A protein has these predicted regions:
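Short, surface-exposed ligand- or partner-binding patches at beta-edge/loop junctions that are enriched
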Residues: 62
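Rhodanese-like catalytic fold shared by cysteine-dependent sulfurtransferases
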Residues: 1-20, 26-58, 67-111
Length: 111
């Protein structure tokens, strides 16, 4: 694990199997393709719904490329959470050949 802006960060290969993943992308991005088992909480709703994020373990925060997840990681860290920003986001996840699922009935893809 590394740090970006003094916040914990990890590559997609460093995410432990079964670790909680928080996807902060918007609904249409989530619907097109996401990590199976991830929790969806758009960055635009994070302040109102932060209590839905587990407090008792590291949570790996992901977006499309890493910008929104870095902002979400900074926000959550202020309030006692243990967030880890996922470097490269869903783009890196897909590039690594890791599986994604779709909610649309079409082939999963990263928007």
């Amino acid at each position: 694990m590394d740090t970006v802006n003094n916040l914990p960060s990890a590559t997609v290969d460093e995410i432990p199997e079964g670790a909680p993943v928080l996807d902060v992308r918007e609904q249409n991005e989530w619907d097109a393709g996401h990590i199976e088992g991830a929790q969806h909480l758009p960055l635009s709703q994070l302040a109102e719904r932060a209590e839905e994020v587990p407090l008792d373990q590291d949570v790996y925060v992901i977006c499309r490329s890493g910008g929104r997840s870095l902002r979400a990681t900074a926000y959550l860290a202020q309030y006692g959470y243990d967030p880890v920003n996922v470097l490269g986001g869903m783009g890196a996840w897909a590039d690594a050949g890791k599986p994604i699922v779709s909610e649309t009935g079409e082939a999963a893809r990263v928007l």
